[in-house]
Design a protein with these regions (language model features):
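NAD(P)+-binding Rossmann beta1-loop-alpha1 motif at the extreme N-terminus of oxidoreductases
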Residues: 1-51
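Residues at the starts of beta-strands that form the adenosine-phosphate
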Residues: 2, 25, 106, 126, ...
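Anion (oxyanion) recognition and catalysis
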Residues: 20, 121, 176, 232, ...
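Short phosphate-binding/catalytic loops that engage adenosine nucleotides
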Residues: 24, 43, 125, 180, ...
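Rossmann-like NAD(P)(H) cofactor-binding subdomain of soluble oxidoreductases
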Residues: 52-144
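Rossmann-fold dinucleotide-binding core
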Residues: 110-195, 201
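N-terminal glycine-rich phosphate-binding loop for ADP-containing cofactors
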Residues: 200, 204-222
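NAD(P)-dependent Rossmann-like dehydrogenase/reductase catalytic/cofactor-binding core
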Residues: 217-333
Length: 333
């Protein structure tokens, strides 16, 4: 199998680099300065066991690869707000022997949130969800770090519509040769909804900074209470905190230090967009559909989007000001 990593940022480059180290055939898909750096200097990937430079083929789109191969695996690691453009571009790519990628090739959605699987299922016949537990950092072109140990990350995977198949097992085997644990599960979306609850704090970190603070923890708990209530009202199951702890404890330990997460990194790089619509916004959507007020998540989504649109630096708001906005929104309910 050849792995085409669509979005070679923090997550994509780490998975792609680790797969390449283990002998898998990999193509990294990137754009702009990052693509130029990867082509010129290679991928500089730092993990717990050191720094290596990987010379991996780089493409900016499907046209550069010509006909895709029947054994290609598409790993979608762009942020959800960029998923439609990527799915449309790659879905129409022709595959040797006839048909398109959307008709014949598997696409794995390795992203935060739960919307990309739904977007992919509108276009692709073979869609897999991946619940990504892989703290990684991408702040400058061509350079990525993922410092967890003893494993680089844990990647639960399965069919997005439920169930698992032999292909998932083969992909998992490649990942497990590459520094990951990759449990194949029948209910991958249940794991992704649980991860969604954890990601509700991304907007807090992005707007007020990554440093721990009791008021930030309190705001996250309020957002998670709304999230759990919305999931219950919608009849959506999610893995418990105990299940997640059992799956991860002692396997993906981060070294000491404060690091910004994916949303913080988006603001730091000045990308102009942020994934809050598909994290806090997912809870807002479910709340409106099922009669559950979500003022804290509404506030966090709105604040994060203002930061992204206006190019504000991460951490430019005090947690006191953000909490006051959430309190005002809650008082209006």
């Amino acid at each position: 199998m050849r792995y085409i990593i669509i979005g070679a940022g923090a997550i994509g480059a780490t998975i792609g680099g680790r797969l390449a180290e283990a002998g898998a055939e990999v193509v990294l898909v990137a754009r702009g300065a990052h693509a130029e750096a990867l082509k010129a200097d290679g991928l500089r990937l730092t993990t717990a066991d050191g720094t290596r430079v990987h010379r991996i083929p780089v493409a900016e789109g499907p046209a550069e690869l010509g006909e895709l191969r029947p054994d290609d695996v598409l790993l979608l690691t762009v942020k959800t707000q960029d998923a439609i453009a990527a799915l449309d571009a790659w879905g129409d790519a022709e595959v040797a022997g006839g048909g398109t990628a959307a008709q014949r090739l598997p696409v794995l959605c390795a992203q935060n949130g739960v919307e990309s699987e739904r977007l992919a299922l509108r276009r692709f016949a073979r869609v897999y969800g991946v619940c990504v537990w892989l703290p990684a950092t991408f702040l400058e072109p061509g350079v990525v770090s993922a410092l967890c140990a003893p494993l680089t990350g844990i990647l639960h995977l399965g069919l997005a519509a439920g169930g698992a198949d032999a292909r998932a097992g083969r992909i998992a085997a490649d990942l497990e040769k590459s520094g990951f644990e990759a449990p194949v599960v029948e209910d991958v979306m249940r794991w992704k909804y649980a991860k969604l609850l954890g990601n509700l704090g991304n907007a807090v970190q992005a707007t007020t900074g990554p440093e721990p603070h009791p008021a930030k923890a309190a705001l996250l708990l309020r957002a998670q209470r709304e999230g759990r209530a919305a999931l219950v009202a919608a009849g959506i199951a999610h893995a418990s905190d105990e299940e997640q702890a059992a799956a991860r404890d002692g396997k993906v330990e981060q070294p000491p230090g404060v690091r910004g997460g994916s949303s913080w990194q988006s603001l730091h790089r000045g990308t102009g967009s942020i994934e809050a619509d598909y994290l806090n916004g997912e809870i807002s959507l479910l709340g409106r559909l099922h009669g559950v007020p979500t003022p804290v998540n509404d506030t966090l989504r709105h604040a994060a989007n203002i930061f992204a649109r206006e190019g504000l630096p991460p951490g430019a708001m005090s947690v006191e000001d953000l909490t006051a906005l959430a309190d005002e929104a809650s008082a209006r309910v």
